[in-house]
Curated annotation (Swiss-Prot):
Primary role: Exhibits strong inhibition toward Streptomyces griseus protease B (SGPB) (AC P00777).
Domain of life (superkingdom): Eukaryota
Record-linked PANTHER family: FOLLISTATIN, ISOFORM A-RELATED (PTHR10913:SF45), FOLLISTATIN-RELATED (PTHR10913)
This protein's UniProt keywords: Disulfide bond, Protease inhibitor, Serine protease inhibitor
GO molecular function, one term: serine-type endopeptidase inhibitor activity
A Pfam family per the record: Kazal_1
UniProt protein name: PI-actitoxin-Avd5a
Residue ranges constituting the Kazal-like domain according to the UniProt record: 1-48
One GO BP annotation of this record: cell differentiation
Residues the UniProt record annotates as site (Reactive bond): 10-11
Disulfide bridge partners, by residue number: 4-34, 8-27, 16-48
SMART domains in alphabetical order: KAZAL
GO CC annotations, alphabetized: extracellular region
Organism: Anemonia sulcata (Mediterranean snakelocks sea anemone)
Length: 48
């Protein structure tokens, strides 16, 4: 597994991931995708 050294702000700007989960912002989605076995893509801005 690669390191996932993302440091995200806590600014709330929700995005919906391809896993059906709402992330607090795009950076948080990228961090989750990095740690996941399957890539998570941004489906749309806003809550899922």
């Amino acid at each position: 597994k690669p390191d996932c050294p993302l440091i995200c702000t806590m600014q709330y700007d929700p995005v919906c991931g391809s896993d059906g989960i709402t992330y607090g912002n795009a950076c948080m989605l990228l961090g989750a995708s990095c740690r996941s076995d399957t890539p998570i893509e941004l489906v749309h801005k806003g809550r899922c």
